[in-house]
Amino acid sequence: MRYSLLTVVFITASLLSSTVAWSSEVDNIIARKEAPAGVVFEIVSDEADLLGELLPSVKADIQKLRARFPDLPVAIVSHGTEQFALTSKNRSSEIQAHDLVKTLVQSEDVDVHVCGTHAGWYGVSQEDFPDYVDVTAAAPTQIDDYEAIGYELIVLTD
């Protein structure tokens, strides 16, 4: 039991420190006089349920960014184990993640990408994801493409 409690404390502390780090990056962008060309949130983890935990905070940060810069383009790129939460077959077990992503894409004009290469390693194809999730050939290349056009990268990892 003691080992389990220490593990929970460590994981919680790690998530909190990650949240603080990316929140300060968001605050730094908000403090600027001019908006960047866009913002891309990178999520990569080996935690299958991480999207359900992170997306509410990411959505709140997107709202903060857009309160300051209303037309700011935003993208989310997921390319770890967490991306499989967004497969159609996991919709019933990952309702919060699916609902948030669908809202972000359809109502908030946010592009959400998952990695086709990573999916392919596990026998998951583009057709296994719902229409509101874009399956990009390679997530690192997608992120590089965003950065090449001036997007600010905010990395969210476990």
Labelled PLM ranges:
Residues 1-5:
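Positively charged n-region of N-terminal signal peptides that target proteins for export
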Residues 7-18:
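Bacterial N-terminal signal peptides
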Residues 21-23:
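Boundary at the C-terminal end of the N-terminal hydrophobic targeting segment
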Residues 43-55, 88-89:
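Short, glycine-rich nucleotide/cofactor-binding loops
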Residues 53-68:
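Histidine-anchored nucleotide/phosphate-binding helix
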Residues 65-76, 114-116:
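Surface-exposed patches in mature extracellular/periplasmic domains of secreted proteins
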Residues 72-86:
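Acidic helix-start/capping segments at beta-turn-to-alpha-helix junctions
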Residues 87-158:
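A cross-taxonomic marker for long C-terminal extensions/tails that follow the last structured domain
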